[in-house]
Amino acid sequence: MSDVDFESEQYEKCREAGEILAQVRDEAAERVEVGVSHLEVAEWAEAKIRELGGEPAFPVNISIDEEAAHATPERDDDSTFGEEMVNLDIGVHVDGWLADTAVTVDLSGHDELAAASEEALDAALDVAGPGVDVGQIGAAVEEVIEGYGFNPVVNLTGHGLGHWEQHTAPNIPNREVSQGATLEPGDVVAIEPFATDGRGKVQEGSDEEIFALEREATVRDRTARQVLEQITEEFKTLPFAARWLDSPRATMALRRLKQQDVVHGYPVLKEQDGKFVSQKEHTVIVTEDGVEVTTRSR
């Protein structure tokens, strides 16, 4: 037995974040329909998180077709959903303790691809637990996705969740690997299979709407300094959207902060062949004898 106190404030806040997130994810997914605005869904979800007592851990990601991650609407985005594959990736934190989840809403008729990532997550959860090598989880994901005739996205992984940290060790691969990390009681991890009808790798695009603080710095430009103050006070080290910034000159300020390596951007990640990507994700607490899923639907 470990000495982890699973009833401590840390884990209670992780559970609270997961409960909020499960509700928001399910309700947001129901809002995704042909003709509905991307921005409307993202802003609804972010507002609902706050209404329920949490804060967004990162901007709502709305990835379309070949997009796999880091896509969020612009400030005045007028994009609407078409007959597409839509991935919603949403995060919540309660006092810096996080939960992360994702679901595919298929409006494109590629229901088998959506099913592949969902079933792969179920298989991964069956394997996960204390003492389990993460390579075994990856093997379970890979087997299911390839059984559907698709490929896992091998350069995207699940990940640990820390206090005010969205991505920490261990990485949870989506294919079998040797000599991976071992899950331990008390770990909080996001398990996140991605499936594609392409070759199984993503690459960076040119668009960036999500950013995060890289380091604290003294900034001379007044607007950039005001933007940096908002970032530091409101978002700390967690990712934020350009549309969340109050300054009407936020785009220019972000450019200057990037040039000084004060913030970094997250380019939209796309399947390298332009093929569809599906995704399913849950956050779990590794217990003494298995895992507790914090983001399961209630």
Protein language model regions, located:
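Active-site neighborhoods and metal-handling regions in enzymes and metal-associated proteins
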Residues: 1-298
